[in-house]
From Swiss-Prot:
Free-text comment on this protein's domains from its UniProt entry: The Q motif is unique to and characteristic of the DEAD box family of RNA helicases and controls ATP binding and hydrolysis.
Motif residue range(s): DEAD box: 388-391
Top-level taxon: Eukaryota
Function field: ATP-dependent RNA helicase involved in 40S ribosomal subunit biogenesis. Required for the processing and cleavage of 35S pre-rRNA at sites A0, A1, and A2, leading to mature 18S rRNA.
Gene3D superfamilies: P-loop containing nucleotide triphosphate hydrolases (3.40.50.300)
Name recorded for this polypeptide: ATP-dependent RNA helicase rok1
Region (Disordered): 15-34, 45-171, 313-350, 657-729
Residue sites binding ATP per the record: 241-248
Span of domain Helicase ATP-binding: 228-441
Pfam families per record: DEAD, Helicase_C
Ranges annotated as biased composition (Basic and acidic residues): 87-101, 686-695
Motif (Q motif): 183-211
Length: 729
């Protein structure tokens, strides 16, 4: 009998998180969109989208009428009746071309519809070019003397500058959104095989980032271009979208489709045509796996960059080089690739023949510069550079390497796209200056648009998960709170119910190892014991890291203790929650950490953050992110961060923010000192630790004795072998 239930049988509690509630691990969400609210549904069902549209039609054609309300899709662009098609039919042409022409002509939305849909989904597209470049240059006509005199007077007068608000309004764009993935084939004419692969993956309703970015990258006719450029020019694009919103799919579809077209137009020109840069090996491997699913049967080869791989032919090398066959490049990263590398181990490694190269910055820079011993080689065929998690790649840690790769791509039609859930203004300015510098270096005369697409509120956490900020006072309090998550007692309305699988983030590698050893035996043997908990960090070998990732995805590992190595980009669709055992170094890191749950619109994810007395000066930025996320959620539930707490938490200076971002909380960096007692992750007594330290000292002393040469008998053995040489003088 449960005593708590007996004593509280007449008490009414608020509905808590029951075990039968919706969890991310229960499967795919019905609608992956985050910002489709009831107001948008009313707009889509109103007469603004159900009434007739005025269209320019051929003579003799009647006005097109929309279908029933049931035929309307999510975005108000319903099926058109047969009367809307042109009367003159081209019977000889393929039906696919007819569909494409019909969709381009009849299904185009007016600006009011585009504006309404983009605003309801919180999508904002902005032209990032200088304001002078946005003004269309019109051809000068012959002017009379009076007009010339008047124009001269106007030029002499001081130009009326627009206010910031007017400039922002002038920069706003409203491109036509993607209604469904079927439009990729009918309207944007992507590869047939690529469209089939997308359908086989089960993608039907595009997310906000796909809704806005795919039309831009595939050639949206509704985006105004500067005069002198083609109407459907692919832009340079900066995308800021929530975690788990499908950014990988958004940049892989246009890249693969562009390469398929290139193969048809220039079959003789083969080589690396696109480079995708990611900050970690885990994220790069994931991009390759997702890309190969989309590129299946298209002839596009996607390769994961590995150590020792050659990507270019250098002029200062021997001419006798082997080139990997296309079939070999598809199996890179497998056992066949290792055998192929072993065959060429006597000579030099073969040049990789691939269309899309996915890499981390340092690996590719070393390959292009022969491990920093030679000048950086160029990649003349690359036409697309994709920076996934661009804010990290352009941080001081990776900035020089990333910019070196960017500058080594010398094709005049190179397009760059930067993707992340958090992107500061400094990253935008750096990208803008790099594009301008590259244009001046290559003496390009053609101008390309530079657009920024923002989904939701910039640098905010996803609104479909619950956030919990828990004060634990001390390190032992955090450990106790974490054990209560693993072994929950009688449930109440205020309890945090977090079911495996979930991630635990720590600040440093030693703390991750210590926490793993502390929790190793907390799961009973009947449930799998210590095999259900693992630790993952950068000091492990590549084989160990990939094996742990594989077991975690299979469900063999339930709890994974890690550092910020897995904070970005890695897609675990069934993660039920995230535990920040140590507070993140910045608000951006918090956004990425908690974004490992709630992927693709899944509801029920929980993000728990523990903080101690030493963390209080650094918590306010995280509390602000949680507060904004709960406002975006728009529910009447009790807030996890109260207003009094936001007012009480101290503000952090800019200098301290930079120090925190670089080094983390200082209290947790003091290992082996007196202050280490406060931050130690352990429940062992002092006596047990002393015994362990004595044992370690004895083992190390024994090893040192074995490694030192013997002094006694060995030193006298040489004299014995020489024999007696008489008395010394």
């Amino acid at each position: 009998m449960d005593a708590f239930k007996l004593l509280t049988r007449s008490t009414k509690f608020k509905a808590g998180n029951s075990l039968s509630s919706t969890l991310p691990s229960k499967g795919k969400a019905e609608n992956p969109q985050l910002f489709r609210d009831a107001e948008a549904e009313k707009l889509l069902e109103s007469n603004a989208f159900g009434k007739k549209r005025k269209r320019t039609q051929a003579a003799g054609d009647s006005d097109a009428e929309d279908g029933n309300a049931g035929d309307l899709d999510f975005f108000g662009s319903g099926k058109r009746s047969a009367a809307s098609a042109p009367s003159k039919k081209d019977e000889d042409g393929p039906s696919e071309q007819k569909d494409a022409s019909d969709s381009e002509g009849d299904d185009s939305m007016d600006e009011v519809e585009r504006r309404t849909i983009l605003n309801s989904h919180k999508i904002k597209v902005t032209d990032m070019r200088d304001f002078e470049e946005l003004q269309p240059t019109q051809p000068q006509k012959e002017e009379s003397k009076k007009k010339k005199k008047k124009r001269k007077q106007q030029e002499e007068e001081p130009a009326q500058t627009l206010t910031k608000k007017e400039q922002k309004k002038a920069r706003r764009l409203f491109p036509e959104p993607l209604v469904s993935f079927k439009q990729l084939r009918t309207k944007y004419n992507i590869s047939r095989r690529l469209a089939e692969n997308i359908a086989e993956q089960g993608f039907t309703v595009p997310t906000e980032v796909q809704l806005g970015s795919l039309p831009l990258l595939l050639g949206d006719q509704s985006v105004p271009q500067k005069s002198g450029t083609e109407k459907s020019t692919e832009p340079d694009l900066l995308v800021v979208a929530p975690t788990g919103s499908g950014k990988t799919l958004s940049f892989m579809i246009p890249v693969i489709n562009k390469i398929v077209r290139h193969h048809h137009e220039k079959p003789e020109e083969r080589g690396i045509l696109s480079v995708v840069i990611a900050p970690t090996k885990e994220l790069a491997s994931q991009i390759v796996n997702e890309g190969r699913k989309l590129a299946l049967g298209t002839g596009v080869k996607i390769t994961l960059m590995k150590k020792g791989m050659r990507v270019v032919e250098r002029d200062d090398e021997d001419d006798s080089k082997d080139v990997l066959d296309e079939d070999d490049s598809e199996s890179l990263g497998s056992e066949d690739d290792e055998k192929a590398t072993a065959k060429n181990s006597k000579g030099k490694a073969p040049v990789t023949k691939s269309d899309i190269l996915v890499t981390t910055p340092l690996l590719l820079v070393n390959a292009l510069s022969a491990n920093r011993t030679k000048p950086l080689a160029t990649l003349p065929l690359v036409r697309n550079v994709v920076l996934d998690e661009a804010d990290v790649l352009l941080d001081p840690l990776f900035r020089d390497q990333t910019l070196d790769i960017w500058r080594s791509c010398t094709h005049p039609e190179l397009r760059a796209s930067l993707w992340s859930a958090t992107m500061g203004s400094n990253v935008e300015d750096l990208a803008k200056s790099t594009i301008k510098e590259r244009k001046d270096t290559l003496s390009e005369t053609k101008s390309y648009p530079l657009l920024r697409l923002v989904v939701g509120l910039k640098d905010s956490a996803i609104p479909n998960i619950k956030h919990k900020l828990v004060y634990a006072a001390t390190e032992q309090g955090k450990l106790l709170g974490l054990r209560q998550l693993l072994h929950p007692a009688a449930a109440s309305s205020t309890d945090i119910r977090l079911r495996p699988p979930f991630l635990i983030f720590t600040q440093t590698i030693p703390r991750a190892v210590a926490l793993h050893s502390e929790l190793r035996y907390d799961i009973p043997p009947e449930a799998g014991g210590s095999s259900r908990i693992a630790v993952l960090h950068s000091e492990l070998s590549d084989g160990q890291r990939s094996e742990i990732m594989k077991q975690f995805r299979k469900g063999e590992i339930w709890i994974l203790v890690t550092t910020d190595l897995l904070a970005r980009g890695v897609d675990f669709r069934g993660i039920n929650g995230v535990v920040n055992y140590d507070i993140p170094n910045s608000a951006a890191v918090y956004v990425h950490r908690v974004g490992r749950t709630g992927r693709a619109g899944r509801e029920g994810g929980i993000a728990v953050t523990y903080y101690t007395k030493e963390d209080i000066p650094y918590v306010k930025s995280i509390a602000n992110v949680i507060d904004v996320s709960e406002k975006l959620r728009g529910t009447d539930e009790e807030k996890s961060v109260q207003k009094w707490l936001l007012d009480a938490l101290p503000d952090l200076s800019k200098k301290k923010k930079e120090e925190l971002k670089k080094h983390g909380v200082k209290a947790r960096q003091t290992q082996g000192t007196k202050d280490d007692k406060k931050t130690r992750i352990s429940t062992k007594s002092g006596y047990e630790r002393r015994q362990e330290n004595k044992k370690k000292a004895l083992i190390s002393a024994s090893r040192n004795r074995k490694s030192q040469p013997k002094s006694g008998a060995d030193s006298g053995s040489d004299d014995d072998n020489q024999g007696w040489q008489g008395l010394e003088d």
